[in-house]
């Protein structure tokens, strides 16, 4: 699978070489390399191919008793031999994606201090805020191109996990490599340890993070600024991905820094891009336009509102005015439909609130604001998207009412992990007589209904962010814009089996994700060039750059370099 046979010249030898995950080959070191690098006697006699190694570790993986055990085992391989880890993933991505990322990574974050084995990435704690430059210089990799950073305050649907949130950057960067071909040598996971308000963690004698309540307000903002400044000094061209920051910080941080460096928030922008790509694919398959849809959101946090704004932007591209587009988006939170008469709406929610006069008479009961069923009924909804983190909010009554207004509604329960999903695909299909188009945030098995097998699309950000990262790295874009994200959404939609005629799933199978990432990368890079955010080149040069930056897991020959 390697694209080059050029040898790699390295200065490490003996046990030190075996302890470097990026360079270790384990039993695959050749006889010549074992002599040249002082490895004789440190490894079993037999020299194995990487395929033979994959067979062994997969056999060991299958012996693990639980999904968490499998996660721990895969991480141990990653910490020992990164090339073997990614070759194993490449061979079994469908099976292992739910183990290295959602839903299993959620439990791994909760148990982080209990299952901790060895260091990976950087832990930057608030008490060490005056040493951030030194900490970044301590990174074992120099040529960092992508950083995923979290402060762990909103890990999936699990809330504040303290330093346990490190599992998310590690998992996300594993997907950058497995799905988007970004070399693991160019990636760095970081957790910002600003304390935790999770009392269970503070009281846990095994908790490894800073035992202090979360820093907030100006102290928090100043700490983030110190971190951003230090990153820009160390790696001025890096792509910085914000991950699992709380709603109150996620949008303000994105708005503050998106024009200062190449950054994006995957929870807001990545989720929005894959959701819009899924919605565009469904519309194309039904020969409808996005502007014909009425979209109801259950959950009005930063992720839901980010998706809504991305849909509005796509509707405007189709020709709707902004006011027309906003009238087709309905945000429902725990109090009901967001309307202008609501108090305490956040700024990004106010833009999506319906005019009170437009929804007068929608309230069926004694509630102050229209509830979900009221909204679905009166809006004539055709699409319903769940980003609430609350199990069971898509009730049978609500889904059946949705089906009344649309023969083939698109239903997207996106909350993670599976225990938080608004409704299961089996429930949705049963309540719509098998007619709904379903895309979920977590993986679900195919559903048998009406004598046919329905494959469930996983509307997972892994379809989007690896391709965005690959495109940014390939063209050396200086920023990530909304138009680049829209280009990614359109590229994803064009890959849908429903659009290409290759199947009935809304999104392509995971076995095709590397090709999908390449197409998204090209679309993103083209748009970056069109906006003047990357040097203009020919399309052929872009394709060559994408392939040049697409790392494949295979061993290179080593040669000894004198120190």
Curated annotation (Swiss-Prot):
Keywords: Metal-binding, NAD, Oxidoreductase. A divalent metal cation binds at residues 243-244, 267. It is an enzyme of class 1 (oxidoreductase). This is NAD-dependent malic enzyme. Belongs to the malic enzymes family. Pfam families: malic (PF00390), Malic_M (PF03949). It comes from Pseudomonas syringae pv. syringae (strain B728a). GO terms for molecular function: malate dehydrogenase (decarboxylating) (NAD+) activity; metal ion binding; NAD binding; oxaloacetate decarboxylase activity. It comes from the Bacteria.
């Amino acid at each position: 699978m390697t694209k080059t046979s050029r040898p790699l010249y390295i200065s490490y030898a003996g046990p030190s070489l075996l302890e470097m995950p990026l360079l270790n080959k384990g039993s695959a070191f050749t006889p010549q390399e074992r002599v040249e690098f002082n490895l004789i006697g440190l490894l079993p006699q037999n020299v194995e191919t990487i395929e033979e190694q994959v067979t062994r570790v997969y056999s060991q993986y299958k012996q693990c008793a639980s999904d968490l055990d499998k996660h721990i085992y895969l991480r141990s391989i990653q910490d020992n031999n990164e090339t073997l880890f990614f070759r194993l993933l490449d061979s079994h991505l469908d099976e292992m994606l739910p183990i290295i990322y959602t839903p299993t990574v959620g439990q791994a974050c909760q148990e982080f201090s209990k299952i901790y084995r060895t260091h990976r990435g950087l832990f930057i704690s608030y008490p060490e805020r005056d040493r951030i430059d030194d900490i970044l210089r301590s990174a074992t990799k120099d040529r960092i191109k992508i950083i995923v950073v979290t402060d762990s305050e909103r890990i999936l649907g699990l809330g504040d996990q303290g330093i346990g949130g490190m599992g998310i950057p590690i998992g996300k960067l594993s997907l950058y490599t497995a799905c988007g071909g970004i070399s693991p040598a160019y990636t760095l996971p970081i957790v910002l340890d600003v304390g935790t308000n999770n009392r269970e963690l503070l009281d846990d004698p095994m908790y490894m993070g800073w035992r202090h309540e979360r820093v907030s307000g100006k102290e928090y903002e100043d700490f983030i600024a110190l971190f951003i400044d230090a990153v820009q000094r160390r790696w001025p061209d890096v792509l910085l991905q914000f991950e699992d920051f709380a709603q109150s910080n996620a949008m303000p941080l994105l708005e503050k820094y998106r024009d200062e460096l190449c950054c994006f928030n995957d929870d807001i922008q990545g989720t929005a891009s894959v959701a819009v790509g899924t919605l565009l694919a469904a519309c194309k398959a039904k020969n409808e336009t996005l502007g014909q849809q009425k979209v109801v959101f259950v959950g009005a946090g930063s992720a839901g509102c980010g998706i809504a704004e991305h849909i509005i932007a796509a509707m405007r591209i189709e020709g709707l005015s902004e006011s027309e587009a906003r009238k087709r988006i309905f945000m429902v939170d725990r109090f009901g439909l967001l309307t202008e008469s609501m108090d305490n709406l956040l700024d990004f929610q106010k833009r999506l609130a319906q005019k009170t006069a437009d929804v007068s008479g929608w309230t069926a009961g004694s509630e102050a604001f229209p509830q979900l069923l009221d909204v679905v009924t009166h809006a004539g909804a055709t699409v319903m998207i769940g980003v609430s983190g609350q199990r069971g909010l898509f009730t049978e009554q609500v889904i059946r009412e949705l089906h009344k207004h649309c023969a083939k509604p698109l239903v997207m329960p996106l909350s993670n992990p599976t225990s938080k999903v608004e409704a299961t695909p089996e429930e949705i299909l049963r309540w719509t007589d098998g007619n709904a188009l379903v895309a979920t945030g977590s993986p679900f098995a195919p559903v048998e209904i009406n004598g046919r097998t329905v494959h469930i699309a996983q509307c997972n950000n892994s379809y989007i962010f690896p391709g965005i990262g690959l495109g940014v790295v390939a063209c050396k874009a200086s920023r990530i814009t909304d138009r680049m994200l829209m280009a990614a959404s359109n590229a994803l939609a064009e890959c849908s089996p429903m659009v290409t005629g290759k199947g009935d799933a809304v999104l392509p199978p995971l076995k095709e994700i590397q090709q999908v990432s390449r197409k998204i990368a090209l679309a993103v890079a083209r748009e970056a060039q069109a906006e003047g955010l990357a040097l203009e080149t020919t399309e052929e040069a872009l394709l060559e750059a994408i392939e040049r930056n697409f790392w494949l897991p295979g061993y290179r020959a080593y040669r000894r370099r004198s120190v």
